[in-house]
From Swiss-Prot:
Keyword Lipoprotein found: no
Organism of origin: Alternaria alternata
Top enzyme class: transferase
Location in the cell: Membrane
Entry-linked Pfam families: TRAM_LAG1_CLN8 (PF03798)
Family affiliation: Belongs to the sphingosine N-acyltransferase family.
Protein name per UniProt: Sphingosine N-acyltransferase-like protein ALT7
Family annotation (SMART domains): TLC (SM00724)
Amino acid sequence: MFRPDLDDIPALGSETSSLDNTVENGNYRVKLWRDKSGIRSPPSTFCTWFKQYQIGLSLGSLLLLILMFTCLPYYDNVSGTYTRGRDDLAFIFSGVVLFTALRAISMIYLLEPLARLCGVHKKLMVRFTEQGWLVIHHSLFWTTGMYINYNSEYWMDLDGVWSGFPERTMTGLTKGYYLLQLAFWLQQIVVVNFEKRRKDYSQMLTHHLITSVLLATSYSYYQTKVGNVILCLVDIVDVLFAFAKLLKYLGFQYACDVAFCVFLASWLVARHGLYLLVCWSIFTILPTVMPYGCYDTISGNRLSEFPADGGNEIMREVLQAFRDPGGPVCFNSRIGWAFLGLLVGLQVLMLIWLGMILKVAYKVFQGEGADDTRSDSEESGYGTSDHEGDCYGAQAGNPKVIRQFVASREKVHIEQAENQGLHLRQQKRSAR
């Protein structure tokens, strides 16, 4: 949604000094953040080490996983479809490793050279590469998701979304799409902790956790159809937001404002219109299409020898595909409320973000230009103020602005270096 400066490594849980050392590593630098005492904290050390070697670590691990799983697990030779099982967990883990490698490779070897070619300044290059990666990912998966949706029996049909429970088999494309989506959001939990902290860090982390739980449980509980619908609704919004940010970093402020307006419209329609319609269908359509009770996962028939209300278990039934493949699975009101609670939790987060978006929209209509309100301090490591960051971001390609900005930063860093040197000399004298 809203998103490592290749020069920025966040010091998790510690404050940073503006006079940090840097380590050259191929085409990019890794900054060694330190706390006020000048000592690198263990989380900071790990972040620096991981970022330096993330490509090698990811590719090495991925090769081992490829040797273990050369194809999607649980293929049925008779029907030509796939089912679920415990080996899917290893495939998901391999997906997390894969996205870690692809993210680093695309940012360093594709998007960073592209940013230089387009004249994006170094201070904005990290944000450009982050948003570029998100455009690539979300565009690919939104297109794939829409292809699956369009060619399904539930296209434009909410009744069809809930019918056929439990749908035990699925195509290879659907299974790969769903498991890789889960792997991506699990990887985003790691990414959000490696990026520089933003004002909505807690909301972002909560969003990634809820999304991952929803994807994992809907997959194991035979509800990939509704999951596909919701992913299609949210992914297109993420594409438009990241694309608008790219236009801003390229200095195309007017195009950025237009893209932002399109993004705002899509946000309102997809996330507060169609998304809530899917949630409402849990009350209106689900009880008739998918009545409470227990079902045979092979035939799909409702079993009369089990409780008519489906019992009161939640996790036991949700994880049935991994716990007892081929056995009966039950649906009850508690499971329905649990899924609805998670979906409503996401809606609350999206309403919080909507408030931030409307602030930006107000600026656009006032002629000030679109700027992410969450990022007013994201360049604070370079000493920029809110106004200075906005002006600089809108005029990234202006050489005069760049020279003035660099000169002012050099002056500040020289003064800080002198003050720190004086402070260290005083400490040495006190120690004697």
